[in-house]
């Protein structure tokens, strides 16, 4: 695809009668930030001089005494917003230092761009493709609070199994049944698939935004767990796609009076929501992961890439599974990939090699640990850097395991390395093991230190010091 220029953007604004341009960038934890300017004020100076903003008010960015930052546009990301009342053009920006004009080291999009450039500089490959499968839950309502004298959360859904005993639906009509059982939601037709029309509207909005869709369906969980798959993209663009995907899914649900969450584990006793990451390397237009003589049709490069992913997984998960809630999902019994091995077809392995027939271009690996709770730019960049390290050092993964890893005898299971079980553990591992991330200056020490301190201070510690409601069930009467 040809690179877009400022002239292309000005033409688009004129042709589409755009009224506002929405300026978008990503904070360090992974939430899109934005502000809007009138289209009449969006001129060539934006491309030359950038737009200023207060970096001290953005999570993970600057201190107040050096808060001024600058945004420069990425014309390739321009899209018409499907939800705004006024005709609005959304565009992603890169963050820069306003004095040196250097790309900002903590800008997640810049990290993703540097990872792509580093891959090319190694000579191993010139392109990394990523395809994300972001699962989510559709709920009718949500409420939660955390106070000094009480903590609670509650979600509800007309298709939730917990509503089988209610006499009425939410609209006041009689309960008509067809509630999805926990772990029983994979592929049922309506009326079990209660939100199929909403999912179709999500799919329509995604296609209108430029996504090439593959399929949409109800996922395993009760209460409207869903998945909509779309075509892969190059690393930076794929991370852009994840955040645009989440924006469209959430706002389509919002317009329909529903609420969507990409939390890894919103429900106790049912499957969590992952973001399986398919990935492959290419050079000069040719795929590098295929060799029909290798196990599962994998080349040596692919096997060593997997070796890097598995070897660094305990620290890598600090970016691919970066929340406390992530580790409520990575537990046995819910199809979660907790075993740090690879396998063909086997979904109980951390890395799966999908069956792709004899098509070399389709050969890829699927890293099944990641979820959607973090920053896709940092997650994809970290996965690529781990894979590159595996290739450069020829890291051999353990022998593939084609058995059901959940049903292994205890002696065999003990020999299988497991993913860490808490955010605290992976943050500690990141502190010990991150040299592979700083190769080529892709991740800086400053970014990694900021990530570690942010996670400890804002997520790990606040949860550690608060009583959990279930503790009252266990201990109130001690």
Swiss-Prot record:
Molecular function in Gene Ontology: ATP binding; glutamine synthetase activity; metal ion binding
Purpose: Involved in nitrogen metabolism via ammonium assimilation. Catalyzes the ATP-dependent biosynthesis of glutamine from glutamate and ammonia.
Domain GS beta-grasp: 16-100
Cross-linked sites for Isoglutamyl lysine isopeptide (Lys-Gln) (interchain with Q-Cter in protein Pup): 14
Name of this protein: Glutamine synthetase
Keywords: ATP-binding, Cytoplasm, Isopeptide bond, Ligase, Magnesium, Metal-binding, Nucleotide-binding, Phosphoprotein, Ubl conjugation
PTM sites of type O-AMP-tyrosine: 406
Subunit details: Oligomer of 12 subunits arranged in the form of two hexagons.
SUPFAM superfamilies linked: Glutamine synthetase, N-terminal domain, Glutamine synthetase/guanido kinase
InterPro entries in the record: Gln_synt_N, Gln_synt_N_sf, Gln_synth/guanido_kin_cat_dom, Gln_synth_cat_dom, Gln_synth_gly_rich_site, Gln_synth_I, Gln_synth_I_adenylation_site, Gln_synth_N_conserv_site
Gene behind the chain: glnA
EC number: 6.3.1.2
GO biological process: one example: nitrogen utilization
């Amino acid at each position: 695809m040809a690179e877009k220029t400022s002239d292309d953007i000005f033409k688009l604004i004129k042709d589409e009668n755009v009224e506002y341009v929405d300026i978008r960038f990503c904070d360090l934890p992974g939430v899109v930030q934005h502000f809007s300017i009138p289209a009449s004020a969006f001129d060539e100076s934006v491309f030359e001089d950038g737009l200023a903003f207060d970096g001290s008010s953005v999570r993970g960015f600057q201190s107040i005494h050096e808060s001024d930052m600058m945004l420069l546009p990425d014309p390739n990301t321009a899209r018409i917003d499907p939800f705004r009342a006024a005709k609005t053009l959304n565009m992603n920006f890169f963050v820069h230092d306003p004095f040196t004009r250097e790309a900002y080291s903590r800008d997640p999009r810049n990290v993703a761009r540097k990872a792509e450039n580093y891959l090319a500089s190694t000579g191993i490959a010139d392109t990394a493709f990523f395809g994300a499968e972001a699962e989510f839950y559709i709920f009718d309502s949500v409420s939660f609070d955390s106070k000094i004298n009480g903590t609670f959360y509650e979600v509800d859904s007309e298709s939730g199994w917990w509503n089988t005993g209610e006499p009425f639906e939410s609209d006041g009509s009689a309960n008509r049944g067809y509630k999805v059982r926990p772990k029983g939601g994979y592929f049922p037709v309506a009326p079990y698939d209660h939100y199929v029309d909403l999912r179709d509207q999500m799919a329509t909005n995604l296609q209108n935004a430029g996504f090439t869709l593959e399929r949409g369906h109800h996922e395993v969980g009760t209460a409207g767990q869903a998945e909509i798959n779309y075509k892969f993209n190059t690393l930076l663009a794929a991370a852009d796609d994840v955040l645009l995907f989440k924006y469209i899914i959430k706002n389509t649900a919002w317009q329909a009076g529903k609420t969507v969450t990409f939390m890894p584990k919103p429900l106790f006793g049912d499957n969590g929501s992952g973001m399986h990451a398919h990935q492959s390397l290419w050079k000069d237009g040719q795929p590098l992961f295929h060799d029909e003589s290798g196990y599962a049709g994998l080349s040596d490069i692919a096997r060593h890439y997997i070796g890097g992913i598995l070897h660094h997984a305990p620290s890598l998960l600090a970016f691919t599974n970066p929340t406390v809630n992530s580790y409520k999902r990575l537990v046995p019994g819910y199809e979660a990939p907790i075993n740090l091995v690879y396998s063909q077809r086997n979904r109980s392995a951390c890395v799966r090699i999908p069956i792709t027939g004899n098509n070399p271009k389709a050969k890829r690996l699927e890293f099944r640990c990641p979820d959607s709770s973090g920053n896709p730019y940092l997650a994809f960049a970290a996965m690529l850097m781990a894979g590159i390290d595996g290739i450069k050092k020829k890291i051999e993964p353990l022998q593939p395991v084609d058995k059901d890893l959940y049903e292994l005898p205890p002696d065999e299971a003990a020999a299988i390395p497991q993913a860490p079980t808490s955010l605290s553990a992976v943050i500690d591992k990141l502190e010990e093991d991150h040299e592979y991330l700083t190769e080529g200056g892709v991740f800086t020490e400053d970014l990694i230190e900021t990530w570690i301190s942010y996670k400890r201070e804002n997520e790990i510690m606040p949860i550690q010091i608060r009583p959990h409601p279930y503790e009252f069930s266990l201990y109130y009467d001690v």
